[in-house]
Amino acid sequence: MEVNKTTESLFSAKVEHNHAQAESHEPRDQRDVKVFSLGGKSSSKQEKLDHGSGRTSSRHETSRSSKEGSIEDKSAEVSSREEEEENRDGFLSGGNLTAGVAFTDTPMAVASEVMIETNAVTMSQIDLQWVEQLVLSTVESLLVADVDGKQLVEIVLDNNSTVPEAFCGANLTLVQTGEDVAVTFSNFVDQDQVAEAMQLVQQNPEQLTSLVESLKSRQLNLTELVVGNVAVSLPVLEKVETPLHMIAATIRHHDQEGDQEGEGRQEQHQGRQQEKKLEEAQI
């Protein structure tokens, strides 16, 4: 009996030793390590690790945000400095009104074109309504033509209060040949109207003289004035001779003499050439 007990005890001890060795291959730590903070609160090991990782990440985020903030602050400082420099170098820097203004030389061709365009615009702004009113109040029809090198203008005077009654409905014809101008009033209703128009012209010699002088100032000569079938005698303007006029007349006289001498010499030369040709033909 004692031997059996001893054997069983040894066997049980061996079995327990084998279990202990088997368990020793896989060691397990079942302890719960707790960390006590200064505030008197405790936390487990896993919570401590989680808290540590969160703190580390928060530190990284804080450092990253601080770096980004510093970069933004630096860029803001740089931009503010550039704005200050631009304001400092602006158009009114130091009270100089021309600071920052670029002066360029305009080519003469461009300047002349601009001047021509400005003049054209200025001319187009002139009020020509009075011309329209004059034509509408005095002219019924207008004809402008060029006949055999002569410029012809024919106007039918309107029956209006602005036109004298003796000339209402008559045709006014102007013919210009070089510097000479001929004026003709025609197509009257009857001979009585022709007589009235002729009488009106003869009773106003001052106006006729003024007409001749105004045409003369425009380098035009009134050579003929006809009312119906009657030619009006034109006033003769007194020629005022000045030293300049005398010099001009002398120059024209010398030019005419020189032209005549040149023509005579040319004729003599042509005659000699013809004589030579005849002699050569005879030989």
Swiss-Prot record:
Q: Which cysteines are joined by disulfide bonds?
A: none
Query: What InterPro entries does the entry give?
Result: DUF5421
Q: Spell out the residue ranges making up region: Disordered.
A: 1-96, 255-283
Composition bias, Polar residues: 1-10
Q: Name the residue ranges with Basic and acidic residues bias.
A: 14-34, 44-81
Family as reported in the entry's similarity comment: Belongs to the chlamydial CPn_0705/CT_671/TC_0042 family.
Q: What is this protein called?
A: Uncharacterized protein TC_0042
Question: Which species does the entry assign this protein to?
Answer: Chlamydia muridarum (strain MoPn / Nigg)
